[in-house]
């Protein structure tokens, strides 16, 4: 049986007290220097973990450089969010070992995972099994992964996939609208999915403001993820301001 590791235990323990906010940094969009600064700011304002990865699949020295820069400037867990089997770094703490359940391409359901499995084991990275579902509009993530996008007005389809993922042993479910999406996952879909599953629910894509974050958490998200809104804020000061606002929206709803 796959044991629950240090990072996953950290997530579950924190969820007993509050809802969580993760920042996603894409090595193709941020340099190691910028990543280190964003990581430091993230920890200062109360972010709970930093995810590293992207749909177009940064890997090798580019990925390692960003992960190491984050680790050197923050004590937050670094969780890989790979676009494919190449998105692995031995310097990370954990990896969301995810299956994109609504992809038309079996490579993204189990192929990439098979190609990366022994590297995860060899590197000693903690794997966290996760069901990944891409909802309209999907943005780059949907296009690259050939996702059969879940319609925004069909929450039961999302719930069916989410529950299937749970029954297949996934310990997290992630609803993805796509980085830079004009809107976040519909509140009704979040509610329906959350009511169907017993594992933590992550929601990402299109979350830019205090109001967005509060709505998403009130609807049932346990963890929200923001990336584009932080990476492309224009300045470190604006990134910090946006992070503080979003975190306030998350923590205000926490039990």
Swiss-Prot record:
Gene3D superfamilies, per database record: FMN-linked oxidoreductases
GO-annotated biological processes: glycerophospholipid biosynthetic process
CDD domains: PcrB_like
Pfam families xref list: PcrB
Residues that bind Mg(2+): 26, 55
Needed cofactors: Mg(2+)
Enzyme Commission (EC) number: 2.5.1.41
Gene Ontology MF annotations: imidazoleglycerol-phosphate synthase activity; magnesium ion binding; phosphoglycerol geranylgeranyltransferase activity
Membrane-spanning residues: none
UniProtKB keywords: Cytoplasm, Lipid biosynthesis, Lipid metabolism, Magnesium, Metal-binding, Phospholipid biosynthesis, Phospholipid metabolism, Transferase
Catalysis performed (reactions): sn-glycerol 1-phosphate + (2E,6E,10E)-geranylgeranyl diphosphate = sn-3-O-(geranylgeranyl)glycerol 1-phosphate + diphosphate
Keyword Secreted part of the UniProt annotation: no
Pathway annotation from the record: Membrane lipid metabolism; glycerophospholipid metabolism
The keyword tRNA-binding is assigned to this record: no
Cellular compartments annotated: Cytoplasm
GO CC terms: cytoplasm
Family: Belongs to the GGGP/HepGP synthase family. Group II subfamily.
Protein's job: Prenyltransferase that catalyzes the transfer of the geranylgeranyl moiety of geranylgeranyl diphosphate (GGPP) to the C3 hydroxyl of sn-glycerol-1-phosphate (G1P). This reaction is the first ether-bond-formation step in the biosynthesis of archaeal membrane lipids.
Protein known as: Geranylgeranylglyceryl phosphate synthase
Species of the source: Thermococcus sibiricus (strain DSM 12597 / MM 739)
């Amino acid at each position: 049986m796959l044991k629950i590791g240090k990072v996953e235990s950290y997530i579950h323990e924190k969820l007993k007290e509050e809802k969580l906010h993760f920042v996603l940094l894409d090595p193709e969009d941020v340099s190691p220097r910028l990543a280190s600064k964003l990581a430091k700011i993230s920890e200062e304002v109360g972010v709970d973990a930093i995810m590293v990865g992207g749909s177009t699949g940064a890997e090798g020295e580019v990925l390692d450089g960003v992960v190491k820069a984050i680790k050197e400037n923050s004590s937050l867990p670094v969780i890989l969010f790979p676009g494919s089997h190449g998105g692995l770094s031995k310097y990370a703490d954990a990896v969301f070992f995810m299956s994109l359940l609504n992809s038309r391409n079996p490579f993204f359901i189990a192929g990439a995972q098979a190609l990366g499995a022994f590297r995860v084991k060899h590197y000693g990275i903690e794997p966290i099994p996760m069901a990944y579902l891409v909802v309209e509009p999907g943005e780059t993530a949907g296009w690259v992964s050939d996702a059969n996008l879940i319609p925004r007005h069909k929450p039961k389809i999302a719930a069916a996939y989410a529950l299937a993922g749970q029954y297949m042993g996934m310990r997290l479910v992630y609803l993805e609208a796509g980085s830079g999406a004009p809107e976040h996952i519909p509140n009704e879909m979040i509610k329906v999915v959350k009511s169907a599953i017993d594992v933590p629910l992550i929601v990402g894509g299109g979350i830019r403001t205090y109001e967005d974050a509060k709505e998403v958490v009130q609807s049932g998200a346990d963890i929200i993820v923001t990336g584009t809104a932080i990476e492309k804020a224009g300045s470190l000061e604006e990134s910090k301001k946006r992070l503080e606002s979003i975190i306030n929206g998350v923590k205000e709803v926490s039990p």
